Amino acid sequence: MTRRLKIIALGGVLMLSVMSCEDQHVALPAQGHWRVVNYWAVWCSPCREEIPELNRLHQETDLVVFAVNYDGKQGEELASQAATMNIGFRVLAQDPGPALGVERPRVLPTTLLVDPAGRVTDTLVGPQTQETLLAIWRTRAGD
């Protein structure tokens, strides 16, 4: 599978388009929306504990949550691993980190909070809860 990454600027807002595991372009971030980007792997026990929290965050809030497989799995293998982890939000087939100016995480899970302008405001290492992510987001968003 060819990795495709598009970076364009519209009105001063960074628009990063990456491929999802469904082979669709996904804009990260969409103007006006905060994004949560989570790095995970099937062998990561804390990731398994964290995914239900991220599923709740995705279902119960306006934050848009994305999953990035740390091992770089693609296609059917990526979809299978995401299903094994019960990920209920969009799974990206490529790492948006380089375009966001973020190095590959050294510890899993790692979660990025990305503001509507495409800037990473926080890099959170270790498992997060819906409550901790909401508290950080509210502080950054000024709620």
State what each model feature region is:
Residues 49, 59-95:
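Conserved segment of the thioredoxin-like fold in thiol-based oxidoreductases
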Residues 36-37, 65, 111:
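Hydrophobic beta-strand anchors of alpha/beta hydrolase catalytic cores
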Residues 39-56:
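Conserved redox-active cysteine motifs that mediate thiol-disulfide chemistry
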Residues 33-35, 39-43, 107:
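Short pre-active-site segment immediately N-terminal to redox-active cysteine/selenocysteine motifs
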Residues 21-35, 99-102:
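A short beta-strand-turn-helix
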Residues 1-9:
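Bacterial N-terminal signal peptides that target proteins for export
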Residues 83-88, 94-138:
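Thiol/disulfide oxidoreductase modules built on the thioredoxin-like
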Residues 8-17:
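Bacterial N-terminal signal peptides
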